Regions:
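Histidine-acidic metal/acid-base catalytic patches
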Residues: 1-4, 12-29, 62, 102, ...
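Active-site mouth loops of central-metabolism enzymes
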Residues: 2-14, 76-88
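Active-site-proximal loop/turn and secondary-structure-junction residues that shape catalytic pockets
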Residues: 9-11, 35-37, 74-77, 110-114, ...
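Short, conserved active-site loops that position catalytic residues or coordinate cofactors/metal ions
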Residues: 26, 31-40, 66-75
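Hydrophobic residues within beta-strands of alpha/beta enzymes
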Residues: 31-33, 69-71, 106, 138, ...
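Glycine-rich, proline-tolerant flexible connector loops at the mouths of alpha/beta enzymes
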Residues: 32-58
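A short acidic, helix-capping loop that chelates divalent metal ions and anchors anionic groups
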Residues: 39-44, 77-82, 146-151, 216-220, ...
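Active-site acidic/histidine proton-transfer and metal-coordination neighborhood
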Residues: 56-67, 77-177, 187-188, 268, ...
Length: 292
């Protein structure tokens, strides 16, 4: 299991190459390329020669000795049927870029305006052939929906353990997996992350987004802050023998710090994640010993 962190906030402030170097220098094992930043206008992958640019980034990262193991597709507006259809071409491009970078999984959000059948027919059925061609898995993520106010939040697509399991089993493709966002189950009217882990199990759960919140909004905060029961989460990940990576998506935690304190903040983030990974391995060993 590798400790991975997202490029988003570093990319926004310094550019993608510097983001990757910083992630390497701060001691992370690999990086998650956030394409909703890297594909923005003026960014490396917004140009017509995006695959060439991806090859350049891949070579740069390889020379640094750090790999891209995961990516996050852009976030186009999928609140209408036409929006979902328009997102297909954006996501195809994102899949191609991610594969060149070396990612094993790309997270592509389902739309919460339709069910699994609608998401498959409008979105994933068009993307899975591209994923297979490029040998990269697509991961759906557990979503939430804001209703008539910022804090009026309810589960969206894949937003309950049962619905997430249904998505994976309905599409039933070796190139389709689950990315469990640990922060989203802390939000109102949702169920704890450990219930999702138990329901998804080893075969369905392929990736994680590690962050936390106070239970009121999607804050993408550092682990150990907020509502998440990290001890139980680590135990359940060990119990299902989770085989994916440990990917931080706690970028908003860094937003409140001045540049002078960013190294200290990232160091705390890194140490927090390493501690959680150690917990998982400790529980994994204990569980194996109990079954011997």
């Amino acid at each position: 299991m590798k400790l991975v962190t997202a490029t988003q906030e570093f990319d926004r402030k310094y550019g993608l190459k510097t983001a990757i170097k910083l992630i390497k220098d701060y001691g992370f094992d690999a990086y998650d390329c956030n394409l909703y930043e890297a594909m923005k206008k003026g960014k490396p992958f917004a140009s017509d020669d995006y695959l060439k640019r991806a090859e350049e980034i891949r070579e740069y990262a390889d020379n640094l000795g750090i790999s891209c193991v995961q990516a996050h597709a852009p976030l186009p507006n999928v609140k209408t049927i036409e929006g979902i259809k328009a997102a297909v071409e954006v996501h195809k491009k994102a899949i191609e870029i991610s594969a060149v970078l070396g990612a094993e999984i790309i997270i592509i959000h389902p739309s919460s305006i339709t069910d699994v059948k609608g998401n498959y027919e409008l979105l994933y059925s068009h993307l899975l052939p591209v994923a297979k061609k490029n040998n990269i898995k697509i991961a759906a993520e557990n979503m939430f929906v804001r209703l008539d106010g910022a804090l009026n939040i309810v589960p969206g697509a894949c937003g309950t353990p049962e619905d997430f399991v249904h998505y994976i089993d309905y599409i039933s493709d070796p190139y389709f997996t689950a990315c469990l966002d640990i922060g989203h189950p802390c939000l109102p009217h949702t169920r704890p992350a450990q219930e999702f882990i138990r329901a998804l199990g080893n075969k369905r759960l392929g990736a994680l987004h590690i962050h936390s919140n106070s239970g009121h909004d999607d804050q993408h905060a550092i682990p150990f802050y907020g509502k998440a029961d990290w001890d139980e989460i680590c135990y359940e990940l060990a119990k299902i023998d989770y085989q994916g990576n440990f990917t931080l998506e706690a970028y908003k935690f860094l937003l409140s710090f001045p540049d002078e304190l960013i190294p200290y903040a990232v160091n705390l983030l890194h140490k927090s994640a390493r501690l959680l990974m150690e917990k998982i391995e400790k529980y994994r060993t204990e569980i194996k010993n109990e079954t011997c």
